[in-house]
Each structure stands twice: as C-alpha cells, then as structure tokens.
Amino acid sequence: MLLLGLSALAVQVQADSDFASVRARYQSSEGRLYDRHGELLHELRVNLKQRRMEWTRLDDISPAFLSAVIRAEDQRFYDHAGIDWRALLASLGSEGTRGASTLSMQLAAHIDPTLKPAGRRRGWSEKWGQMQAARTLEKNWSKNEILEAYLNLVTFRGELQGVTAASRGLFDKQPSGLDQTESLVLAVLIRSPNASPLRVSERACVLGAGLRFPVDCPSLTARTEQALRTAVRLRPHAADAPHLARRLLKGKQTSVTSTLDARLQRYARAVLVHQLDTIGAQRVSEGALLVVDNASGEVLAWVGGGGVSHVDAVRAPRQAGSTLKPFLYQLAIEKRLLTAASVLDDSPLSLASTTGLYVPHNYERDFKGLVSVRTSLGSSLNIPAVRTATVVGADAFAARLRELGFQHVNRDGDYYGFALALGSAEVSLEQLVNAFRTLANRGQYSPIVPTRAVSVQNRRVLDEGASFVITDILADRSARSLTFGLENALATPFWSAVKTGTSKDMRDNWCVGFSERYTVGVWVGNFDGSPMQDVSGVTGAAPVWLELMRFLHTRTPSRPPRTPASVLETEVQFTPAFESARRELFLRGTETAEVRMPTTPPLAQARIRYPGRGSILAIDPDIPIEMQRVFFDVAPRDAHLRLDLDGRPLGNLDAGWTPAAGTHQLTLHDANGTLMDEVGFEVRGAYH
C-alpha cells in the first residue's frame, strides 16, 4: 500500500496540468501555411506517426455525438468527481477493468503516458494511478474542459486521433455535422477501434437503442461497412501552395504565415494551368511561376508546377537560354567596353573552343548585319551577344553571374565558353527572378523571402547607371521589334521591362520581367527535359507573364524609373544609316553624337563569311529535312559576285540551302570568274 501511495503521489504531480497547457502542447499532424493576411493557403501532413486535425472546441461538436460518447464511455460523467464507484464495484467481479474507467481517468492516461501499460491490459495498479490523477483533474478542470480535451486526444481507428480526424477521415465532414448514425459509429470505435465493421454496427445499434435514437440498423450496418472498408483519405481544407508548403512546413513548424497573397496565388495557378492546357498539344506538360515584390523581396505567388508532381520547378535548375543576355550587356556597359549605341556585327561567326569550332546561330537562322547594342539585346540576337562575350571575357561574366546569386554557375569561364552568353549554364526560376529584381532595384541585391521572419540586407552588385540603361532597353518596344514585332505578348499598357529565353532544342522556355513594383518570372517545359514543339518564349511563357502583369496592375500604376545622375541622354546618328537617328542613353563620359562605320569593302576584299573553313554542320533528326536550311553569307553582298556549291551556282542566298550529308566545297567568284575565296565544310546527319 505504501508503494501504491507513493506511485499515486507521483502520478498526481505529473497529471497536475491545466487545460490551457494541454491545449497549448497539442500539435496537429497537419501543417498549415497561411498567406500574408492570415488566410489558409495550404494544409500539409507533417506528422506521419498519427493523424490529428486542429483542436476542436466542444461547441463545434455535434450534440448527438456528445450524447453517444457519454452513454458509451461514462454514463455518470456529470455526477462523479473522477471515479465512478458504482462502475468500479461492478467491475470487481469481472476479469477486466475497462468498464470502470471514467472519461477523466482515460484523459489522465492520455496526458501522462506512464499511466498506460505498454503491450498489456491495464491492471489494478495502473487503474489506481488513473483514479488519483482523475481526481486531480476534476479539482482543477471543468467538466466541459475534460470532455473537450478527451475528444481531441482519444484514438478512434488506426492512426485517427481526435474527433475531427475521425469525422473527416471516415465521413468526410466536420464533427459539427455528424448525424445520429455517424455519432453512434464513432462512439463505439473509442472502445473497439480495431473491431470489424459488423461488430461495430452491432454495438452501435445497441447504443442507439439505449439513447432512443431512431436508428435503422440495416442502414447503419451499410453505412458502417462503407466508412470502415474505404481507405481513409483526409482531404486538405486548402491546397493552393503545395511546393512552398513543403519547403516551409518542416520539423516543429506546423503553422507558418507566408508573404504570399492568397488571391494572387490562386489566380496565378489558374492562369498557368490554362496556358499549359492551351499549348499541351505542343509537347508541353509543366510550368512554374514566381511573383516578387521589388522593394521587399517578399514572395507574393509561388507556383512550382501546374500538376501534382512534387518537383518544385521554381527551384529546379534548367538551361537559361537568352535570359542571361541582359547581365552580359550590363557588365560590358558598366566596364565601359560598349554603349547602347555601339555597333555589333550580326554575321556568321566561328570561334575556336576546347571542343572544336563554336558556331552560334540566331533563333530565326538568319543574319541582321550591323546592329546596335540596343537592338541586339532588345531583339535577342545571338551572334552579337557572343561577340560581346569575347569582349567581356567568359571568366568575368561567370563571376558576375555568381554575384547575382546563380549558384549553379560554379565553374570558371573556360568550362562554359562563349556559349555562356546564350544561356548554356543552368539556373533556377527563383535565381532568375531575383537577378531581374536586382535590375529593377538599380543594382541592389538582396535575397527573396517567403516569410517575414527573415531579415535581409541589400548590397550593391550592379552599377546603377548601367542597370538603368539595360532596363530601358528591355522596356523598349522598338528595340525588340526586329524579332518580335511591336505588338506581342511582351507589350503591356503600362511601363514594364521584360526578356524571354528558349534553351537548346526548345527544352526550356522563359519569360522574366518587372514593373515599377513587381518582378514576375514564368517557365514552361517538361520535367523530363524532353523538347517542346514549336514553342518560343513569346508563345509559351510570355502569355502567362502578360496576364499576371495585367492582373497586378489592375489598379496599381507602373511608372518608368527616374534617370540616375550617372546617365545622360543625347541624340545619336548612325553612318551609314543602318538604324535611324534617336535619343540614346550613355554613362557619362561615353556619349557620342555619331556612330560611323567603315564603307563597304571593295570587291578585292570579298570573302565567304559563313560557314567557316572546316566547319561541321549537323542535320537535326527531329526536324523534317525539307524544313531545314543553311544560310550562306558573303561580304560584301554584290550582284557581281557568284557563289558556287560543289561547282554549281547557288542563286539567291536568302532562300537558303537544304543540307545534304557529306563534304562540300563553297567557292566565291567575281564577274570574270576569278576565284575570290573558297571554304570546305562537312554536313553530318541521317539524310542524303
């Protein structure tokens, strides 16, 4: 007896917890992600050992269920002080002690696990401990508090713990909506959680008769069979941000308030899904988008995919395509190697590399001739970008990208070569969006943040003046018209700056841009890296970008940035006039009134500009041969020059040549038949 007394004293101390403490320690198995206004965005299971929902108040539980539980488990609950002496005396002659356990005693065992025997039935020693603990609870708690806590902690069936988990898991409804039949089934499960559906329904019918519920037992049996035989599927209350929820809801973080805006998040996801449906026939299955506030870096929308995949495409590395060009030109202007009016030659180019000749092409497989930096970037021409990379240096460009947060650019410039200018490196949408946000913030960099719990510091990465010039180019419709036209999915009715990109073989498609207040980035493609069919940045990602920008600026204006002191605007003209005279932006000290180019070279200097000597051209097996063309180029373009391929005149160079596998000889002659230049090249592929 002395040992029992000491045991009871220890139990009493352990069970001496108030209602508020027990409720505060309670943790749902479901993590909840809230938006910036406190609206539930996503519910995600984070505890795989048990299934608990949110704590449920007694007022939110069906009265029928409360009556059924008290009748089944503790008929004199409101009359005793923790111990039902009548039930206890009645159980003395039986083998078990289960029938004498009051709700208070059962609750004590839930609060203090030491009162539950492991792997065996409770004996009188555990019963005695529970009795003492129950008396302590009754002294400090109200009856309603005891009942409420009990119904949130008791196990019903399998992993379902608490009335809300059981109600939603078995009947797909909140406990406030339980009818009499459902209440009887759940009440019986407390004592017999693993019983067969038939046994549960039999006991529920008996319980219903005792409560004088008008129960149809055959119907109850059918309902029980359906509920207990069906796999438990607890549908989340909200499922609008699965990828960010999986990132933020970890460990003990079961409730996180994010910076997302629920209305924008849901709209953004719907827009992306609609676009994926629209272009799905073109071998496009997935997409992602990110919306960020420029000033704070707070994430307003994070959609990691259009489907149910766990892959978060906001963070997944993919080839960048042309989206890195703004940062290449920004570096060249910052170092005063180029200006927005500098002239670049968009003509055939062959560069020696560690793997052989590097021969870049424009997206449209043609050449524009002499173009300014403004036109080159605005119209996303590839060859001028590669020429710029040769001036800037691959090492310097790779280092700048790392400064901007492109963590996957982790090798020196030689590894990437000049192809880095065309996006051969892998980047994530998250990194791209923040890099463009850095441009929007005039070169000030800080991480983007999905919660307000993170404190960030700004640091200057880009020169303010050069960033302003690049921003102005990306906002210039005329600059992009050479490739995209004046009216396209990049044109907004308010001020914005934007860049598209398409990676090799159309595997990735990007559109990233910003307004005065927001930066929006969109990616479309396939998680398995398979190529899309005839999908460009303008037709794939850009429509989503445009729709989101319009939504964001329904009532919010977007004004162009003010010119910094380090930049001036002046009139510039081009001689010869390959581009019209215009007002142009310069870093102070680099301005010029005229850009003069040498006159056309004499015929004596005529040469074949493309292909280069020893070039190897490859036929694409995925494109019908009749759709493929090789465009030869000579300088100067003169009617007195004749280009022959394998001894036969080619005629109109602008029509292109359908490639044929094998070695070929290209020769250039003047009007008298004199040989001016010759080039040998090879075509490799399956077609002959």
Model regions and ranges:
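Soluble, non-transmembrane domains of envelope/secretory-pathway proteins that act on or interact
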Residues: 13-15, 20-21, 34, 214-238, ...
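A penicillin-recognizing enzyme superfamily signal
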Residues: 258-281, 291, 302-313, 324, ...
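Membrane-proximal periplasmic segments of bacterial cell-envelope enzymes
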Residues: 9-91, 95-96, 164, 177-253
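Active-site SXXK
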Residues: 67-70, 74, 268, 296-297, ...
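Non-catalytic, structured segments within soluble enzyme domains
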Residues: 100-266, 399-414, 418-423, 437
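Conserved catalytic neighborhood of penicillin-recognizing serine enzymes
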Residues: 93-118, 233-237, 243, 247, ...
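A short, well-structured edge-of-sheet supersecondary motif
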Residues: 30-44, 61, 281-307, 399-404
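Active-site loop and adjoining helix of the penicillin-binding protein/serine DD-peptidase-beta-lactamase fold
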Residues: 134, 138, 190-208, 252-264, ...
